[in-house]
Amino acid sequence: MHSHRQKWGRQTDIARVLDDIEHDLYLPQRLSLDGATGTDESHVQYGIVKDCSVLTCGCCISESLFNDLCRETSNKQTACPICQRENVRLLSAIKPLRDLARQIDFFRSTTGQGESESDELPAIVKTSPSSSSLSLTPSRSSSTAGLEADNKTLSDPTVKEKSSLLELFHIVASKMHNANTEVGSDHPLTTGTTRDQEEHTTKENYSSSLLEPNYDDHANWKILDNASNTRTVPIDNNFSLMSTDVTIPSTANYQTNSAHDLDEEKEYFFANCFPMYRKKFQFNTHPKFLGTKSKLFINQSISPDCTKFALITEHKWEIYSINPKDNSPQLVSCGKSSGEYGPNFNQLTEQSSSSLSTTSQASKKKKKNWSQRFCKLSNDFLIISGSQNILNVHDIHQNGKLIYTYVSRFPIRCIDIDPRSQIIAYGITGKDRHTGAEQALVVIQQITRNKVTLEPEFPPPITITLPYRDPINTIQLSHDAKYLTCSTALESRFLIISLQKINEPRLIMKSVRSIDTSLESEGITDTKLFPGNPNLMCITSTAFNSSPLVINTKITQINGVRTVAQPSMLIRVDEIGCKIHKCEISPRNDAIAFLDRNGSVYIMCAPTMMDNNEKRRTILVETVANAYRAYESATLRFNPEGNKLYILDRKGTFFVEDFAYGLPQSREITKCKQIFHK
């Protein structure tokens, strides 16, 4: 009778501990209909989630619940049931929490079986190296004397069961950071230690498992401990970011070249260096000899994945690849404005007229005499525009072959292409046929793929008429190509157009900035939406007393089709002056790079970018070639991980600022100049 009471008490203790741990899995689980109100409205019901996943907003819910929400809002933007953020997507499954749920269920089912044999010590073994389930098997003793000694030591049966439970969840915690750890069947439980010693041993074993993380499934295992070091929005890409609060071993322990290990090491270096310390790289694509004058390029661009960059002159263009190991550039393709292309200028191929897709019958005289002025580079295409109202599209996977030419009836003032190479946007200034009055127009050119040949196709463009006669000065597509930002030249207006329904573009935000309109003023020079967070936007300008601004666009708060949002200012960056040509937003959304007229490159970093009074830092990173006009200025680009800043100026000099190269005390790491700290 007494043994039955002990058994019942042990099972009660185990069940209580399991319930406490399982409470962490109490998350949004499913949709249920509310019949009490008389309507078929559904609401989210919480429960124990066994298919836990994380959304792009950072909240954790059930994967089946998210699929139900997507079916409920098929024609609308799916909102997070926890934070109510709209247009969220499923980022990844949280494998450790799913394994924990399965192991809790398994341990509940095997608790009664493990209690039946009181004369044998239960040992936890792994059934197979690839299986994540755990089983309890009796560990055989070689002598009865050993069993008697063990039974004397385990006079308190509660200690025995709790030591087994601690060991079980020690393995679960270690499995989160070490999937290849093998726990053999000859690993008996420590039975003669006190509870404090067991907890101390468990902490030591857990900390040691953090030192050498080895992951067996690199394709599916996604670390979600530190998706971003900012509270604005998580990083939306395929690169895993490791937590920076773990102990990182020396470089000698990273000989396996594991991608996750390297990412963890870089994250540790980045956390210690950014934004004050970096490794500086500099390369000249066209070196000078004997003091000759350096070659100047009209425009340049860096691809969104930071694997290529392009340089153009009036009649030539060049594309370079970036070596991921040493960041050195190498020429991969080049060509001329006449249509010739090839791997180098000594092996150019004539463009055949039959393979060229065009939307208008341009004269041969126009094509031969035109000069290039603007260029943009995506991951797949290089687009170039210039005089004679010509826009060319080159396929960089075919040595820069010209695949599309568009000849507009009006001058093309600015161009852009989204990172996924699906939309080209450019601004033109049209004229009314009857009155001759100028009109600002935005043209959207879609790029589709043939379902059979997978060749790019260019359907008829979509023209958007702006409600202003002021010419368009800048145009910029958002990272996900759902929004288009543009600014005007004379009245310094800036607008946001929604492209979520590409055939029905809609103006969702408009405002004007009161700045100087003298001859030296260039007005608004750049407008950038934050990646993954369209509520934040950075605006730069070159005019008297017009410092860069970070504004709240409020476009996710508008209701109704005809509603237009009115933005509000969040941060005014006065410390870097008022002659800023360009800006670039870090994918981490906690830093902005600025380029002024003199060629100085600054980085302003702040935790949230939501308050002008919050702590922020501004540092001088680099000095590149100056530019009197904004279209001649250098190009800035953060890599997808946000730990490198790439800079390409009009002299063809390529700079790389690597903030994750090493620790600040390393010889190759240099310190930046801090100009502002708040």
From Swiss-Prot:
- Known outcome of mutating T435K: In PTR3-17; constitutively active, confers increased STP1 processing in the absence of amino acids
Basic and acidic residues bias locations:
149-158
Q: Where in the cell is it found?
A: Cell membrane
Biological process terms from the Gene Ontology for this record are: response to amino acid
Reply yes or no: does the keyword Cell membrane apply. Answer: yes
**Which branch of life, at top level?**
Eukaryota
Q: Where is the composition biased (Low complexity)?
A: 127-144
Q: Where is the composition biased (Polar residues)?
A: 179-194
The effect of T525 to A/D/E is: Loss of function. Abolishes hyperphosphorylation of PTR3 and, consequently, results in a failure to activate STP1
For this chain, the Swiss-Prot or TrEMBL PTM comment says: Hyperphosphorylated in response to extracellular amino acids and dependent on the amino acid sensor component SSY1. Phosphorylation is positively regulated by casein kinases YCK1 and YCK2, and negatively regulated by phosphatase PP2A regulatory subunit RTS1.
- Oligomeric and partner information: Homodimer. Component of the plasma membrane SPS (SSY1-PTR3-SSY5) amino acid sensor complex. Interacts directly with SSY1 and SSY5.
The protein's name: SPS-sensor component PTR3
| Organism expressing this protein natively | Saccharomyces cerevisiae (strain ATCC 204508 / S288c)
Read off the lineage from the record: Eukaryota, Fungi, Dikarya, Ascomycota, Saccharomycotina
List the gene name: PTR3
